[in-house]
From Swiss-Prot:
Gene Ontology, cellular component aspect: ribonucleoprotein complex; ribosome
Protein name, as recorded: Small ribosomal subunit protein uS8
Keyword Ribonucleoprotein: yes
Domain of life: Bacteria
Assembly mode: Part of the 30S ribosomal subunit. Contacts proteins S5 and S12.
Originating gene: rpsH
Gene3D superfamilies in UniProt: 3.30.1370.30, 3.30.1490.10
Organism: Rhodococcus opacus (strain B4)
SUPFAM superfamilies noted in UniProt: Ribosomal protein S8
Amino acid sequence: MTMTDPIADFLTRLRNANTAYHDEVKLPHSKIKANIAEILKREGYIADYRTEDAEVGKTLIVDLKYGPSRERSLAGVRRVSKPGLRVYAKSTNLPKVLGGLGVAIISTSTGLLTDRQAANQGVGGEVLAYVW
């Protein structure tokens, strides 16, 4: 069975594993998922990620991050642009997540960027997800 929205599946698996206090999550690999994982690592929401060869294709393994008393670093994730309703934003109208405390992941012509990076570069694009 084909998957309609692999990005939503990726974000849902991260959220569920984080809620259940898992140490890592294994997911099917794709370039866009690896780019999202790189942004989450750079912003401090996950500890690390790596790819491994599986029997069929590759596997993306995401190591989740928790605080000293097991508080979650990933409080929430929301998919914004979906296959049935695409959401785009101009560089002058980029969303702020929780007043700047969270991150919006934007797919631009220069690759995946956070809302702050896209504003600095003056590019807009498709708003993929909010992370806080």
